[in-house]
């Protein structure tokens, strides 16, 4: 859920995960 489960967002904001 959130940025971590959205591949494009996760790639853009890896620090979130």
UniProtKB/Swiss-Prot annotation:
Residues 5-7 are annotated as: Ser-Xaa-Pro motif, crucial for potent interaction with nAChR. Pfam families: Toxin_8 (PF07365). GO terms for cellular component: extracellular region; host cell postsynaptic membrane. It is found in: Secreted. The modification Cysteine amide is found at residue 17. The keyword Glycosyltransferase does not apply. Keywords: Acetylcholine receptor inhibiting toxin, Amidation, Disulfide bond, Hydroxylation, Ion channel impairing toxin, Neurotoxin, Postsynaptic neurotoxin, Secreted, Toxin. The cysteine framework is I (CC-C-C). Alpha4/7 pattern. This is Alpha-conotoxin In1878. It comes from Conus inscriptus (Engraved cone).
């Amino acid at each position: 859920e959130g940025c971590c489960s959205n591949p494009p967002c996760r790639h853009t904001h890896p620090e979130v995960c």
